[in-house]
Regions:
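Conserved beta-strand-loop-alpha-helix junction that forms the acyl-donor binding cleft
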Residues: 121-131, 147-152
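Conserved acetyl-CoA-binding loop of GNAT-fold acetyltransferases
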Residues: 135-145
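Conserved hydrophobic beta-strand within the GNAT/NAT acetyltransferase core sheet
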Residues: 86-88, 119-123
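Conserved catalytic core of Hanks-type protein kinase domains
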Residues: 31
């Protein structure tokens, strides 16, 4: 079974998760420049060259989430040793329609079926919308943590396995 980052697309009931590529760079730069997206990503913004670098990182696969043939969001799957996790967002106009839980569940099931022992997410505790979306996708809260080198605020470790999905 190929990884989605190897060109494989993953379908949910409402969404298609496909690898992000060069053709998506300007779209991803624009999305990250939107204050309603950036605030959930520690206000990170990127130039096109910086985005290309991000898309080419080792250990991280980047994806575009599509609904009804239109790009509506971003997911990334990262792997470090036996640990692996997802991060993602939807553009503001796509929120509240169940698209992120659908896309995240589809990608998590694919990764778990491909050998990942579990998939984690780490939303900030203040991001109730994300926590609810991850719960709807099948992720279960495991623990809460203070800010650290990777998190600017208190965050929640949530886990999913084939048993919870």
């Amino acid at each position: 079974m190929g990884l989605p980052g190897d060109g494989v697309e993953v379908r949910g009931e409402l969404t298609l998760v496909r690898p992000a590529g060069e053709a998506d760079v300007d779209l991803l730069v624009a999305w990250h420049a939107d204050p309603e997206v950036a605030r959930y990503w520690d206000d990170e913004t990127f130039t096109p060259d910086e985005m290309r670098e991000r898309l080419g990182r080792d250990g991280v696969d980047s994806f575009i989430v599509e609904a009804e043939g239109e790009p509506v969001g971003y997911l990334q799957a990262w792997r470090s040793g036996v640990a692996g996790g997802l991060d993602g967002f939807l553009i503001p106009g796509a929120r509240g329609r169940g698209l992120m839980p659908d896309a995240a569940r589809a990608l998590a099931v694919f990764l778990l079926a491909g050998g990942w022992p579990e998939v984690t997410v780490d939303p900030y505790t203040w991001n109730d919308r994300a926590i609810r979306a991850w719960q709807k996708a099948g992720f279960v809260e495991h623990s809460r943590h203070p800010p650290d080198a990777d998190h600017s605020a208190e965050w929640v470790l949530m886990r999913a396995s084939l048993r919870t999905l």
